[in-house]
Amino acid sequence: LLQIAEQSENHQFPKGTLRDFPDYAMRGFMIDCGRKFIPLSFLQDYVKIMAYYKMNTLQIHLNDNGFKQFFGHDWSKTYAAFRLESDTYPGLAAEDGYYTKREFIDLQKLAENLYVEIIPEIDAPAHTLAFTHYKPEIGSKEYGMDHLDLFNPETYKFMDGLFKEYLEGDEPVFRGKKVHIGTDEYSNKKKDVVEKFRAFTDHYIRYVESFGKQACVWGALTHAKGDTPVKSENVIMSAWYNGYANPKDMIEQGYKLISIPDGLVYIVPAAGYYYDYLNTKYLYENWTPVQIGKAVFPEKDPSILGGMFAVWNDHVGNGISTKDIHHRVYPALQTLAVKMWTGKDVSVPYADFDKQRNAISEAPGVNQLGRIGTTPGLVYEQASVAPNSETPHREI
């Protein structure tokens, strides 16, 4: 209703009856806080933005690491971070930025009040250099220290302790109904490793379930095809790349899918691969959550719970700021919010939609774009500025 008022003269509401409901239950966004610390205030604003655009799922990727080749091919020097305060493992949280338990709980409470569910993600057994920096003996000597050693019982003890810290108690740190356990991009070079990976995945699905949570995983079980059973009932799988998890096979095995196809909805700022800015026109005119790569399902297929898009901060320290991230994410969020709500039945031409979305604010009380009104105007001017001099104008 506020968006209607924003687009009308004198903020008036037209007279009539509205009847509106979504085609897809889960409509979300994933943000990589592991490779780049995202300030709490930014996440708070994004909860408000998502609520304003009727998106209801924010996945927070809490750990990750850079690429070894950019750090002298030395794992010990490669950037890695885990972003949540830990009492079980003092010093595990990244020195350059982390969230206290109380901050993370309060963020989730804010989200709950706005009907946004936060899904925390601890990614393992790959992307785990932050954990092996802390406890080197659980790192894989064969596949790299960003992989956990799945043959070492200490690996399970460490990860059990980490998940337990945030899942147990009367007021757990992870408040929501769902917890994401990662499970993407682990090596499949040897059959015994694949079977260990499948066992690890099954263990942590059941482990988070033992605390009353619904487990979410990244799709990997086509890449890691094997004999060890992995629980599928009531498990949500992020379908990101069909070579890692064939969506038709995963549905047949019993998984419910979130559509997050990397070739269409991954933003990797200033990387030179994937999208820097999503092709919002193409997505608006062509995509719905039932299109996962080249696999296309009937609209509103009950096995596909909804869709998400993601920003991955792959290149550590590349100068990209949170303002830069917002500049990329915000138009994508506006566009995909419509597609995840309406599916194929959008009726407004893209040019009109694009004009309308630019006329709407980010959310009440949010101004990450630094807008000054809706009509461009002169703020101040100065004919020239001498080198090393200061202007009397404050930065805006």
Language-model features, listed with the residues they occupy:
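Feature activates predominantly on carbohydrate-active enzymes
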Residues: L1-H147, E154, D160-K178, M308, ...
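Flexible loop/turn segments at secondary-structure boundaries
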Residues: F37-P39, N65-Q69, P125-F131, Y186-K190, ...
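Soluble non-cytosolic domains of exported or imported proteins
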Residues: F37-S41, Y98-R102, P153, K157, ...
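Non-transmembrane alpha-helical segments in soluble domains
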Residues: V47, Q108, I205, Q334-A337
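Generic beta-strand/beta-sheet core signal
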Residues: H61-N63, I119-P125, G182-D184, C216-A220, ...
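Short secondary-structure boundary/capping segments
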Residues: S76, Y134-I138, K196-A199, Y273-D276, ...
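Active-site neighborhood of glycoside hydrolase catalytic domains
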Residues: F131-I236, W240-K256
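Flexible, acidic glycine-rich loops studded with aromatic residues
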Residues: D227-V235, N242-H393
